[in-house]
Regions:
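Active-site helix of classical SDR
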Residues: 125, 162
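SDR active-site lid
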Residues: 179-248
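Canonical Rossmann dinucleotide-binding motif of NAD(H)/NADP(H)-dependent dehydrogenases/reductases
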Residues: 2-36
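The beta1-alpha1 cofactor-binding region of Rossmann-like NAD(H)/NADP(H)-dependent oxidoreductases
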Residues: 42-43, 64-75, 107
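Conserved glycine-rich Rossmann-like NAD(P)H-binding loop of the short-chain dehydrogenase/reductase
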Residues: 31-48
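Residue(s) in the substrate-gating loop at a strand-loop-helix junction
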Residues: 146
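Substrate-binding pocket helix/loop in short-chain dehydrogenase/reductase
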Residues: 101-102, 106-114
């Protein structure tokens, strides 16, 4: 497919109140895209929309929607389409994270992660893709997964399940939508310094413990800013890339997983040992 000219394109951005979603909306706004924004917090979303408009961006809609509610997403889509027509680009960025070993993760943890990280994007795609297809002018879908959709990271069983699921959806749509001239990008960020990290829940572990704080600081030392991640996302969108990485370490790790599986396996074992040791020092709640 030819490169995508983002100017004047209608772009839906979920998770737009802050973090990667907010930064991506800002980059798209500078590219003169027409923005439809959603998140859970209407007040934070309004503040983001005001800041974007003050910077010269065109914000068509900024509406709080619970993406886990299929009916609410459908109503939102109907309102957007009635007022502004089909979207040209859909960016599924909203997400949550919970870490924990399998014996500490609860049924609620699994449900919340799958509902938000997998079914949320599914609801968005189900409501916004049909009009995009019917418009017959092409388009693009961006699904933001995670490095946890590539690697078997320790304590990520439930989170990885949700993100591997989104990766699977993306892999199928990559080929299903091609005949409609709709491209698909799968974004796999590594460490990104966002509020998601600050509010991260680690099941059954005291996050305030020095050993856990040390692990978090090591994580953040490798983190890129949301702005760097957003630039990578929009660059991948413009070039219609399928695999989009926000940092070099994830790209290299993905190559190592495929071509040096013994090295990948060793790295995962060492990382698992490090986190297990940190949890043992912190104590289990």
């Amino acid at each position: 497919m030819a490169k995508l000219d983002i100017r004047t394109k209608s772009c839906l951005v979920t998770g737009a109140a802050g973090g990667i979603g907010g930064a991506t909306a800002a980059v798209l706004g500078r590219e003169r895209a027409r923005l439809v924004l959603t998140d859970l917090d209407q007040r934070a979303l309004d503040a983001r929309a005001d800041a974007l408009r003050a910077a010269g961006a065109e914000v068509l809609v900024a509406r709080a929607v619970d993406l886990t509610d299929a009916a609410a997403v459908s109503r939102f889509a109907d309102e957007v389409h009635a007022a502004h027509g089909p979207m040209d680009v859909v960016l599924n960025i909203a997400g949550i994270s919970v870490w924990g070993t399998i014996d500490r993760l609860t049924e609620d943890h699994w449900r919340r992660l799958l509902d938000v990280n997998l079914m949320g994007p599914v609801h968005v795609l189900s409501s916004f893709l049909p009009p995009m297809i019917e418009a017959r002018r092409g388009g693009h879908v961006v699904n933001v997964a995670s490095a946890a959709a590539i690697f078997g990271l320790p304590w990520h069983a439930a989170y990885s399940a949700s993100k591997f699921g989104l990766r699977g959806v993306s892999e199928v749509l990559r080929f299903d939508l091609r005949r409609h001239r709709i491209g698909v990008s799968l974004v796999c960020p590594g460490a990104v310094a966002t509020p998601l990290v600050e509010g991260l829940e680690v099941a059954g572990v005291d996050r305030a413990a020095p050993s856990i704080r040390k692990v978090e600081q090591q994580f953040l030392r490798h983190a890129v800013t949301p702005e760097v991640a957003a630039e990578a996302i929009v660059r991948g969108l413009r070039r219609r890339r399928y695999w989009v990485y926000t940092s070099r370490d994830i790209r290299l790790g993905h190559l190592a997983q495929r071509w040096f599986p013994w090295g990948y396996s060793l790295a995962m074992r060492l990382l698992n040992r490090q986190l297990t040791g940190a949890a043992a020092k912190a104590g289990v709640r």
